[in-house]
Regions:
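Generic hydrophobic/aromatic pocket-lining and core-packing "Φ" positions
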Residues: 19-20, 63, 88
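Short glycine/serine/threonine/alanine-rich loop segments
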Residues: 54-55, 96
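Conserved SAM-binding strand-loop segment of SAM-dependent methyltransferases
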Residues: 56-62
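Beta-strand-loop-alpha-helix segment that lines the small-molecule cofactor/substrate pocket
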Residues: 67-69, 74, 80-81, 85-105
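Conserved acidic residues
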Residues: 32, 57, 73
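N-terminal Rossmann-like dinucleotide-binding module
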Residues: 1-52
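Conserved donor sugar-nucleotide recognition element shared by glycan-biosynthetic enzymes
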Residues: 15, 59, 84
C-alpha cells in the first residue's frame, strides 16, 4: 500500500501529541516532515519519529520549506491558532491539502 506523506506544522503540546498518539500509529501514514519555529521542538519531534521505527523526517523552522521538493502530500497545522489561516492558505495555494487540528481557527 502506498503511504500518505504528512507534514506536521506546530510541535507544541497539540502537534507533538497528535504525532505521537495518532499519526505514528496509523497504517498508510508516514510523517515525512516536521516544522516549528522553535528548533528544539523540531528536533524532539524528529527524534520521536525516528525512535518509532520510521525514517527521520525533514526538519524545518519555516513552514514554507515543506512545500519544496515534493516532501509532503498534505500537512496538518497544529501551530498557534493565530497562524492557522496564513499557513493553511499558503499550502492550499500550492495545491497541498491541509488539515487543521482546530476547525475554524
Amino acid at each position: 500500500m502506498e503511504q500518505l506523506r504528512v507534514g506536521i506544522i506546530g510541535l507544541g503540546q497539540r502537534g507533538y501529541g497528535l504525532t505521537e498518539q495518532i499519526f505514528l500509529n496509523m497504517d498508510g501514514i508516514r510523517v515525512t516532515a516536521v516544522c516549528d519555529v522553535y528548533p528544539d521542538r523540531v528536533a524532539r519531534a524528529a527524534d520521536l519519529v525516528e525512535r518509532s521505527d520510521h525514517p527521520r523526517p525533514f526538519e524545518a523552522t519555516d513552514y514554507r520549506e515543506l512545500a519544496q521538493g515534493n516532501r509532503v502530500d498534505c500537512v496538518i497545522v497544529a501551530a498557534s491558532w493565530s497562524c492557522h489561516t496564513e499557513i493553511s492558505c499558503f499550502f492550499l495555494e500550492q495545491g497541498i491539502p491541509v488539515g487543521c487540528e482546530v476547525g475554524g481557527a
